[in-house]
Amino acid sequence: MEEERVEGSKRPFQGIIRDVKGRALCYKQDWIAGLRSGFGILAPTTYVFFASALPVIAFGEQLSHDTERSLSTVETLASTALCGVIHSLLGGQPLLILGVAEPTVLMYKYLYDFAKGRPELGKQLYLAWVAWVCVWTALLLFLMAIFNMAYIINRFTRIAGELFGMLIAVLFLQQTIKGMVSEFRIPKGEDSKLEKYQFEWLYTNGLLGLIFTVGLVYTALKSRKARSWPYGTGCCRSFVADYGVPLMVVVWTALSFSTPSKLPSGVPRRLVSPLPWDSVSLTHWTVIKDMGKVSPGYIFAAFIPALMIAGLYFFDHSVVSQLAQQKEFNLKNPSAYHYDILLLGFMVLICGMLGLPPSNGVLPQSPMHTKSLAVFKRQLMRRKMVMTAKESIRQKATSSQVYEDMEQVFIEMDKSPLAETHTTLINELQDLKEAVMKKSDDDGDTGEESGFDPEKHVDAYLPVRVNEQRVSNLLQSLLVIGAVFALPVIKLIPTSLLWGYFAYMAIDSLPDNQFFERTVLLFVPPTRRFKVLEGAHASFVEKVPHKSIAAFTLFQILYFGLCYGVTWIPVAGIMFPVLFFLLVAIRQYLLPKLFKPAYLRELDAAEYEEIPGTPRNPLELSFRSNNSARGVQECDAEILDELTTSRGELKVRTLGHNEDKGHQIYPKEIVEVGDGDMSSSRE
């Protein structure tokens, strides 16, 4: 099973026209589906809001440090809210979540370092010059969309995506270390004679910061795994897993006020940001007036960083969009890669002229959004289908009639302007039909006499559906607007908690990153490798010789070191995206000469293939599990958690290398284990 491939065309505007026509057919339905969801849509909305707002607040504090408060949390929140509203109303793929991301912060730091060192620009014209960079960036994005360049994303394989993810993770950890060290130092521009900056209080602030940073990281990581806790009800575990991280920020912020009263004001150090209505914040909205003050030489020089930023946004935005609409989610509405790049260009232009850092598609919030809507849609469909089945059984309907009633409900709830044919829908329900009829043949003719259990069998055989709509994206963007005006409360958060949140994001992104997994595998001695095979592991562990794994991983480590090293070069570090585009050519022309094609396919697979370490009933993306027959109940979100990586990427479960591998187990298959025999049926 391959990732959806972006279609290309030699005719200008062809991709945009195709995208607009495709999305226009379902635009009205996008709103109807969201409004019909009622208050239930608030669950995925708040879930995505907290997942989106916290990183943006952290990036705002980082920007404030890197640009000497030329930009702050006000601007990052405003950009996220503005771009989120625009995309939810006009975007092609409404499941895509936009926000200010680490690459943008990194680029803006390089641009600030360049402008500060030039008397013609300086801090005064920094944002005006950056606005010209955004103008060039927007023009380049327009050209990419017009000439259908989105198909190039097909050439970016796992090796590029995981190297980029690892680089961001390391930059997060780097920012954590820098932030923790800064807690022991006097901030730039502050009066060193103030009481809070005396040695003993600086040391106290640093130690408190260390406690808060480590405390948040530990509790956030623990709460993230709450669904697998053995105690508590399913609802409680799901709540802690979904909202545990922002909850821990609130808890640790509250604890920061429990310090002794003798501590001077400013210990522990808290978020520093102007309020939206302060004069400092209002000046950013008039940056367009200063653009004429930038000399022509610097206007044309802005094209160089714009080229890097446009390429970075194109890569990041398209990859995130792919992960938000993976085939395994069974989305009904078409993609809009070319049109979304065009719209991104307009948003970059608007943000630049308003003095805001632009927003683009973000990970893992976008696939998290899709996953939360899949859980919500499943709950709605399951509830109605179970009720219908029970009513039919109560009326002593035959098993075939029970199935037909449930089938009708499924078709009715799955209606969309671009819905699949009736035959395709029926094929997806084939396993449910077989379960109903099998029980009828074994136990009786009517639904009541048969062994068919609506609660168990509907839960096991219900296909994945996503509630594709625009309301949740719009609502979470409006909540971000609310966060802008809630800055007086947000400023109560200790800065050390934001450094801890950076560390949490870095650590949480490492599991399921195959580059990281292979790096760890290098340190496992041959006598202990059986331990790796005992747990769930990537398929390459069994299918590729260890020497080839080691060689491929060492190449990645060296290339990663090169990418990370470039980011340390003053000003010129802005060129680091070039290395990721160069990697496309290396992957296509050099690596096939160094590794066998079969090995390279495993090491750089399009999908995350996983082999179970111990025999157990596999969980399917169709939410079917025989565990329920053994009395084990798993909530919908827990099933999807096991099926997705930390990036939101869906896993493909395969048989072990030494097992019977007549075929690969795809998400739409179920393996039924009987009395010692194993058989599989395809939907």
UniProtKB/Swiss-Prot annotation:
Side Cytoplasmic, residues? 1-38, 102-126, 180-200, 260-294, 357-477, 587-683
Taking the first listed entry, what is the main subcellular location of this protein, grouped into a coarse class?
A: membrane
Matches recorded under InterPro entries:
HCO3_transpt-like_TM_dom, HCO3_transpt_euk
Q: Does this UniProt record's set of keywords contain Membrane?
A: yes
Q: Which domain of life is it from?
A: Eukaryota
Q: Which GO terms describe its molecular function?
A: solute:inorganic anion antiporter activity
Q: Which GO terms describe its biological process?
A: monoatomic anion transport
Pfam families per record: HCO3_cotransp (PF00955)
The way it spans or sits in the membrane comes to: Multi-pass membrane protein
Q: What are the protein's UniProt keywords?
A: Anion exchange, Ion transport, Membrane, Transmembrane, Transmembrane helix, Transport
* Segments traversing the membrane: 39-59, 81-101, 127-147, 159-179, 201-221, 239-259, 295-315, 336-356, 478-498, 566-586
Q: Which family does it belong to?
A: Belongs to the anion exchanger (TC 2.A.31.3) family.
Cited function = Putative boron transporter. Boron is essential for maintaining the integrity of plants cell walls.
Which protein, by its recorded name, is this? Putative boron transporter 5
Q: Which organism is it from?
A: Arabidopsis thaliana
Gene encoding this chain?
Answer: BOR5
